[in-house]
Structure formats: C-alpha cells, structure tokens
C-alpha cells in the first residue's frame, strides 16, 4: 500500500544506503559519503603547525595565517584580507 500511496518516500528511503562507519550519518551517494569521511580523516595537514583540515582550500586559507598573505582587498578602502 505504501508503495502506491507514497512512492517518493519509499524511493528516498531506498536511496539512503551509504552509511558512515565512524558516525551515524547516511548518504544517498558514494561520492557524498567519501567527502564526509574526510571530516574524520582530515587528510590536508599544515607542514608548519600540523593542524589538519578536511578540504584543501581550508588548508590554503590557514597557511595564510603563517605567511601573512592577504590576497583580497576592499575596493573602497583598499584594506587587505586573507
């Protein structure tokens, strides 16, 4: 009966079959699960202070705290930001 009454509900429940073994999260695609697993493994590590990040762009932003690089600036006041 549920299959005919609420087919979307059943389909959505059937799709959620990629579970994280480290926590209770469940994903609808293997790619989404792989991206999530990076939050546990933190593969991007800073060579200077050894702080770890899940995404490379987060590490790149962090490295600017060591280098002092400020690549972004305000068009109005010209103040620079990391």
Curated annotation (Swiss-Prot):
Principal place of residence: nucleus
Keyword terms of this UniProt record: DNA-binding, Metal-binding, Nucleus, Repeat, Zinc, Zinc-finger
Molecular function GO labels: DNA-binding transcription factor activity, RNA polymerase II-specific; RNA polymerase II cis-regulatory region sequence-specific DNA binding; zinc ion binding
Pfam families for this protein: zf-C2H2
Zinc finger feature spans (C2H2-type): 1-5, 18-40, 44-66, 72-82
GO cellular component: nucleus
Compartments where found: Nucleus
Annotated family: Belongs to the snail C2H2-type zinc-finger protein family.
Record protein name field: Escargot/snail protein homolog
């Amino acid at each position: 009966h549920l299959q005919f009454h609420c087919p979307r509900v059943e389909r959505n429940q059937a799709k959620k079959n990629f579970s994280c073994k480290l926590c209770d999260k469940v994903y609808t695609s293997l790619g989404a699960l792989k991206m999530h697993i990076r939050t546990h493994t933190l593969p991007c590590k800073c060579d200077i202070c050894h702080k770890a990040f899940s995404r490379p762009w987060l590490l790149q932003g962090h490295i600017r705290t060591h280098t002092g690089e400020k690549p972004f600036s305000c068009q109005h006041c010209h103040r620079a930001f990391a």
